[in-house]
């Protein structure tokens, strides 16, 4: 079956530590993306994830929300510890267990118009898997995992050795400010976007925290605002929420600017509570219309 939108990535076991609280919960791009999509009027969406048998309840929870899930077996689940300071844009991480990488055999029957690669660690998707998926779908990716190296449970930022080859196959790429600098060596978003586009990416999404986001596609820049929040409770999964909203709207035919603003409004709602996005399209549209939320 051909799906309209698909996310491939790991549901993780997360420990989230903030100055005022410690929370244990499922996490990872696959979790936050699928949970966000489940709150939208998305049809024909597929989640492909890998979990250890003892953690499969997290996938069952998503299935129970009406999302189709393909579960790939793995000996271990990715396990993360996310520690935030007073500034929610600053995060340190530990990785206490790693899952097996996705392989072509796992994904040969996956068919979708748009496939989002929810990377968490550099080994999640090989260049061969990226090429295979790009041969049958429009690929989107979050660059974060490709820039993360694990040593002694600590996560270190590293450049992506295969970026100039791999990015030829990725249509839409998202990076935050720090990832943008690691990937390109540029601290100015417009310069970074142009360089990423030179490497072959058709649409570049740069999320800039409370400064909003920048989209570059077809030779044009689009400045997307960050809508004000009442309070910032939990930033974990905000980038995944942004991508879910953006790709959902683009799959419906929305413009770059419309999709970006929709995604930004989703993030405003998500930031104000623990866990994944739990809002509605009505609440998103209220923010976009300037109605107090």
Place the predicted regions along the sequence by residue:
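Histidine-anchored nucleotide/phosphate-binding helix
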Residues: 28-39
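Structural detector of well-ordered beta-strand residues that form the stable sheet scaffold
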Residues: 6, 139-142, 205
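Conserved beta-alpha-beta core of the PfkB/ribokinase-like small-molecule kinase fold
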Residues: 118-194
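Short glycine-enriched, charge-decorated loop/helix-capping segments at active-site entrances
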Residues: 20-25, 153-156, 230
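Short, conserved phosphate/pyrophosphate- and ester-handling motifs at nucleotide-, phospho-/glycolipid
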Residues: 37, 176, 239
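Conserved phosphate-binding/catalytic region of the ribokinase-like
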Residues: 159-164, 189-293
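Conserved N-terminal subdomain of the carbohydrate kinase-like
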Residues: 2, 13-24, 39-118, 123, ...
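Active-site metal-binding loops of divalent metal-dependent hydrolases
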Residues: 10-11, 29, 241
């Amino acid at each position: 079956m051909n799906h309209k939108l698909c996310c491939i990535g790991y549901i993780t076991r997360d420990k989230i530590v903030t100055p005022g609280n410690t929370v244990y919960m499922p996490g990872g791009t696959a979790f936050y993306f699928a949970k966000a999509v489940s709150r939208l009027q998305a049809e024909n969406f597929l989640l492909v994830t890998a979990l250890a048998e003892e953690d499969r309840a997290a996938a069952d929870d998503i299935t129970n929300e009406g999302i189709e899930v393909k579960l790939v077996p793995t000996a271990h689940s990715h396990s993360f510890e996310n520690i935030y300071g007073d500034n929610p844009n600053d995060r340190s991480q530990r990785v206490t267990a790693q899952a097996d990488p996705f392989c072509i055999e796992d994904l040969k029957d996956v068919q979708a118009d748009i496939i989002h690669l929810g990377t968490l660690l550099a080994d999640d998707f090989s260049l061969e898997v990226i090429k295979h998926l790009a041969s049958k779908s429009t690929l989107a990716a979050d660059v974060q995992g490709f820039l993360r190296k694990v040593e002694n449970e600590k996560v270190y930022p590293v450049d992506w050795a295969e970026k100039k080859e791999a990015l030829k196959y990725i249509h839409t790429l998202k990076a935050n400010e720090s990832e943008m600098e690691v990937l390109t060596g540029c601290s100015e978003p417009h310069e970074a976007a142009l360089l990423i586009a030179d490497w072959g990416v058709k649409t570049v999404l740069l999320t800039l925290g409370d400064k909003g986001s920048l989209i570059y596609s077809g030779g044009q820049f689009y400045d997307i605002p960050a809508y004000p929040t009442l309070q910032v409770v939990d930033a974990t999964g905000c980038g995944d929420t942004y991508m879910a909203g953006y790709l959902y709207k683009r799959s419906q035919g929305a413009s770059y600017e419309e999709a970006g603003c929709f995604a930004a409004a989703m993030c405003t709602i998500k930031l104000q509570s623990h866990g994944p996005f739990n809002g509605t399209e009505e609440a998103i549209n209220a923010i976009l219309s300037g109605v107090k939320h």
